[in-house]
């Protein structure tokens, strides 16, 4: 999303799937060319990424299918640092889909976001396979669904591993749920470790948010770090479509997050020109100020309270649940949860829902934050039923993606316990949105 005025160092690389190293002729050994940190010319980008893009059911460009609509648009701050993905038939499991949006920040945030987009689903799939085979899962479910239940409609797993529970109800298939939850937590942990080891992506002062979701039948498991958000469109008792926020915006001033940050000697305060935006700062340096408490990358802050452990929540879907919207803060800063649900519901076709959200957010940015540049936007709308009356032909064309003029030419390259009132995050009202990651000015905050 934003930019970082300080940058340094880099971190490790993923092994190439194909190709062999160049062998120079006899005589003087040829020195390998230097690679700028954060360069897109990494071995992963050149070999593994094209293979990923040919996987059936994996989508990362503007487009739609019968049940999903994706759309991203570059803002006015530089490269589009937002990324998104939908992977149908994920993990070779029937009626299973993986969705995610990622909001990069810092000088190489666009690269970090796309790297996480590409690798995190692979790590999650690997952990799912290591738990148990699909056949064993079905056998286990058939043996245990009658007597093994989880209390509550929504189960929330906090950073310390303790569970918090909301909306009392009974949920079957405990083994399947625990498998999904455990796999998401492990995948996030290994993803951050891999970023730290990579030499071709500078993640010291660059990183990304992530909100990901696995839908397996009627089971919905969401993992979240940062301030991207997932919102459910659900019918209330009056049959009115209302928003239900599935994730919590993990800002530094959230009490549980602030307690951890202060315990790790990180500082939390807002700048004078954006008093409602709390930031995480190093204890003795005037940079960087990160407007979130959890993120992939940003290793300069990892010893001072920033973590990559996801908040994981579970929900058992019902017939009243109509769609889920995953989006970066370019959407949520400009639109309330209620507005987002209304726009999706009123879209002429499901395939146009993602574009409609982005266009509405851009319009709102121009009057809500007139002194700020429009932010990047990325949105995934997943519809939870299969009604065909609002569907249109799926569209995934490289030409459309590029000719729109709204996104980069990429192919070659918790939870609230009650429905949201639609008022949005109060700390954003009247604030000029600047950057996710900034340097501290010459002044420092006064002591309380």
Curated annotation (Swiss-Prot):
Pfam families: PP2C (PF00481). Mn(2+) 1 binds at residues 103-104. Its EC number is 3.1.3.16. Its cofactor is Mg(2+); Mn(2+). Residues 1-48, 401-431 are annotated as: Disordered. Expressed in the whole plant. Residues 67-384 form the PPM-type phosphatase domain. The keyword Cell membrane applies. Mn(2+) 2 binds at residues 103, 329, 375. Residues 27-37 have a biased composition (Basic residues). Keywords: Cell membrane, Hydrolase, Lipoprotein, Magnesium, Manganese, Membrane, Metal-binding, Myristate, Protein phosphatase. GO terms for biological process: protein dephosphorylation. GO terms for molecular function: metal ion binding; phosphoprotein phosphatase activity; protein serine/threonine phosphatase activity. The keyword Hydrolase applies. It catalyses: O-phospho-L-seryl-[protein] + H2O = L-seryl-[protein] + phosphate; O-phospho-L-threonyl-[protein] + H2O = L-threonyl-[protein] + phosphate. Coiled coil: none annotated. Residues 412-426 have a biased composition (Low complexity). Acts as a protein phosphatase. Belongs to the PP2C family. Interacts with KIN10. This is Probable protein phosphatase 2C 74. The lineage of its organism: Eukaryota, Viridiplantae, Streptophyta, Embryophyta, Tracheophyta.
């Amino acid at each position: 999303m934003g930019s970082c005025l300080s940058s340094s160092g880099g971190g490790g690389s993923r092994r190439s799937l194909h190709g062999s190293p160049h062998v120079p002729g006899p005589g003087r050994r040829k020195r390998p060319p230097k690679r700028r940190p954060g360069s897109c010319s990494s071995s992963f980008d050149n070999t593994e990424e094209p293979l990923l893009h040919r996987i059936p059911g994996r989508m990362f460009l503007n487009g739609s299918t019968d049940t999903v609509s994706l759309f991203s648009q570059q803002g006015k701050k530089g490269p589009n640092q937002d990324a998104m993905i939908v992977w149908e038939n994920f993990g070779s499991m029937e009626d299973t889909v993986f969705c995610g949006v990622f909001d990069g920040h810092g000088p190489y945030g666009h690269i970090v976001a796309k790297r996480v987009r590409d690798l995190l689903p692979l790590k999650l799939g690997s952990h799912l396979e290591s738990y148990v085979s699909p056949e064993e899962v079905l056998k286990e479910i058939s043996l245990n669904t009658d007597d093994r239940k989880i209390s509550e409609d929504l189960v929330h797993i906090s950073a310390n591993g303790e569970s918090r529970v909301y909306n009392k109800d009974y949920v079957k298939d405990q083994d399947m749920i625990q498998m999904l939850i455990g796999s998401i937590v492990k995948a996030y942990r290994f993803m951050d470790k891999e970023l730290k080891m990579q030499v071709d992506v500078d993640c010291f002062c660059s990183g990304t948010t992530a909100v990901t979701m696995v839908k397996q039948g009627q089971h919905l498991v969401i993992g979240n770090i940062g301030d991207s958000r997932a919102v459910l469109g659900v019918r209330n008792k009056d049959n009115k479509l209302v928003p239900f926020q599935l994730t919590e915006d993990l800002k530094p001033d959230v009490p549980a997050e602030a307690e951890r940050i202060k315990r790790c000697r990180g500082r939390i305060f807002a700048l004078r020109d954006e008093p409602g935006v709390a930031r995480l700062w190093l204890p003795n340096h005037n940079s960087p100020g990160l407007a979130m408490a959890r993120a992939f990358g940003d290793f300069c802050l990892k010893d001072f309270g920033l973590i990559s452990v996801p908040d994981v929540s579970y929900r058992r879907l019902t017939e009243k649940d109509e769609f889920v919207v995953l989006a970066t803060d370019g959407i949520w800063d400009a639109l309330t949860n209620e507005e987002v649900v209304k726009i999706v519901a009123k879209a002429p076709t499901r395939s146009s829902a993602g574009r409609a959200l982005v266009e509405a957010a851009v319009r709102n940015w121009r009057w809500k934050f007139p002194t700020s540049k429009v932010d990047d936007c990325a949105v995934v709308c997943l519809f939870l039923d299969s009604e065909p009356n609002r569907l249109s032909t799926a569209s995934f064309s490289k030409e459309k993606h590029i000719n729109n003029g709204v996104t980069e030419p990429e192919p070659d390259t918790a939870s609230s316990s009650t429905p949201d009132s639609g008022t949005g995050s109060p700390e954003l009202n009247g604030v000029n949105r600047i950057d996710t990651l900034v340097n501290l000015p010459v002044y420092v905050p006064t002591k309380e």
